[in-house]
Amino acid sequence: MKPSIFADAVITACQACDGHALAELFAIGGGVAASALLELGDVRPGGMICSLRKCSGYLGSPWEDMCVNHLRSLYSFSLASSLPASASDAVDGEGKTRSERLGEAFDAYNSVVSAFVRYFSTLTPGRWALPLLRILCLNLRWLAVQADSAAHIASVSNTWAPTRSTQPNKRLEECARQLNKAFSACIADRNADMHESRKWGTYEVVGMVFKTYFRLKSVGLCRNILRAINAADLPDLCAYPRSQQVTFRYYVGVLAFLNEEYDHAELELQASLQMCHRCALINQGLILTYLIPVKLLKGSLPHPSLLDPTTPIGRKLAVYQPFTRALRTGDVKAFDQALANPTIESSLVKRGTYIAIERARDATLRTLLKTIWLSLPLNPTNTRPTRLTLTLLHHATSTDLIRLKYSIKELEWILATLIYKGYVKGYIAHERGVLVLSAKDAFPALRTVAIATT
């Protein structure tokens, strides 16, 4: 496809308000991109403009600049693809490395996105252009990740070279700024006709913004996006495509989880899981990564098959297997050993679930105490005993079966903590060394216990 034919295709799609056709034309991959590369001709900006202007129609603003930069990006990306990713010092015919070519591809495509977002922010009605906005944002983010990855490999392999003033994730940070502008262009639409509003692209872009912020470890910036959404007059979330609902509710749930708002996190993550397509196993695994710790805190244990490391989902979730077993049986020793395992600890810290799992230890202690209580003989009135001596509890927890090395004073402190947090109903008669349990519901169901975050 010659540049002039490419330009005519863009003109036709614009006149027809065909966002899907434009998305296909401005995609980095696909048949159109491959066809355009075959007959690109003069790759200099001036030469490209001349080639584009040979079209039969008029390529107005911002489409001419977008076409030039898009074709430049395709050219740079094709040269980068011809170089091996493992050989960071390999150069093409013009003496440029893969890292440099990917940087050029990103910069050129960033100019495409910037020009379109400026145009899109004033477009009324603008809903027809949402497919193009989506593909531009997706491709920009993908190029940013590729360029930053190549730059990192080059900087690591060329340690002998003079130090350059480069920053990690430089392009991804620029991508985040562009995505923010795209989000503003969608949410700020004042078109009275909601059916044709740009607001229908809000949650699509928000999903990309959240994903980018999480990769940049700038999770706090997501709060600004949520505040803007709450203040905006948007259609109900349920009116958007289900895929966008799943993504949005997943990230809202994770944000609530990281902020230790476990009730809210459970609500959002549960809704996201229920709407997730049954074949989207990777997405289900991501959701369950945070939902399972919340469920453990509430005393709801996953089925063992869900944590089976031989299944696609289980491989990602198997790290929770020792904790669910310990919580089910009250095996505090096994819980502590799993938490102290360097591999498990590293995995939990990386996911951001370590603190939540650590908090489940109180629930495991409560299960242990209840198990001991249930093993005691009944009173003459055929009821469970409500007075347990600390000496008895200390002896029970020190047996070879349980193996907890607590002194009586430490055990008393643990019991007082469980009572304070609501895991046990009763009080400690310190002077007599007796735990006095409530005659009714001495061990409340875990789902009814408020999760302490201090």
Curated annotation (Swiss-Prot):
Record-annotated PCI domain positions: 246-442
GO BP: poly(A)+ mRNA export from nucleus; post-transcriptional tethering of RNA polymerase II gene DNA at nuclear periphery; transcription elongation by RNA polymerase II
InterPro entries attached to this UniProt entry: Csn12-like, PCI_dom, WH-like_DNA-bd_sf
Any one Gene Ontology cellular component term annotated for this protein: transcription export complex 2
GO MF terms, alphabetically ordered: double-stranded DNA binding; RNA binding
Gene3D superfamilies the UniProt entry points to: Winged helix-like DNA-binding domain superfamily/Winged helix DNA-binding domain
Domain of life: Eukaryota
SMART domains recorded: PAM
Similarity field: Belongs to the CSN12 family.
PANTHER family linked to this entry: PCI DOMAIN-CONTAINING PROTEIN 2, UNCHARACTERIZED PROTEASOME COMPONENT REGION PCI-CONTAINING
The protein's name in its UniProt record: Protein CSN12 homolog
